[in-house]
């Protein structure tokens, strides 16, 4: 994690907090950028480039097999750097939450593969993984918000004048 000024966040006994890997909290970033794009479109060129870059990365990892945690260099983390989901076993999954947020990034993109990410979200199932782990809260809500984004129904609600 970083501080708001971009410096590395240091915690207990001068140790860096976490590994800096892309994982659960990071999943929200593509959808947050899609939200900003939908509501304000303040930096369209950068947002489009970001959307296509992140979708290209996950597509290159296998659209049906990409995992839910990566090192910042794009490699798979070593076992000691994998964060267990919800106290469950330390495994990498093809998580519905990440499928959802990467699909929401399709709002930013003009390339052909965006439709494939939307199709994967549409056909995703909110059910336990093969190992029995199930997170209706995080995976389920990211899935719901992605559907809202892509349907055009995630809007700013303003008071009636």
Listing of model-derived features with the role each one plays in the protein:
Residues 32-35, 39, 105-161:
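Terminal, non-catalytic domain-edge segments
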């Amino acid at each position: 994690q970083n501080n708001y000024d971009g410096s590395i966040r240091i915690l207990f006994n001068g140790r860096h907090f976490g590994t800096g890997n892309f994982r659960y909290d990071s999943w929200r970033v593509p959808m947050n950028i899609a939200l900003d794009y939908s509501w304000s479109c303040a930096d369209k060129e950068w947002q489009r480039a970001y959307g296509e870059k992140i979708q290209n990365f996950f597509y290159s990892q296998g659209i049906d097999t990409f995992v839910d945690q990566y090192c910042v260099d794009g490699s798979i983390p070593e076992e000691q750097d994998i964060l267990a989901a919800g106290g469950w076993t330390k495994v990498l999954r093809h998580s519905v939450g990440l499928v959802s947020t990467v699909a929401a990034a399709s709002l930013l993109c003009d390339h052909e593969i965006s439709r494939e990410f939307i199709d994967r979200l549409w056909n995703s199932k909110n059910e336990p993984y093969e190992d029995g782990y199930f997170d209706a809260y995080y995976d389920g809500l990211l899935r719901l918000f992605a559907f809202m984004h892509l349907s055009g129904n995630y809007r700013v609600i303003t008071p009636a004048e």
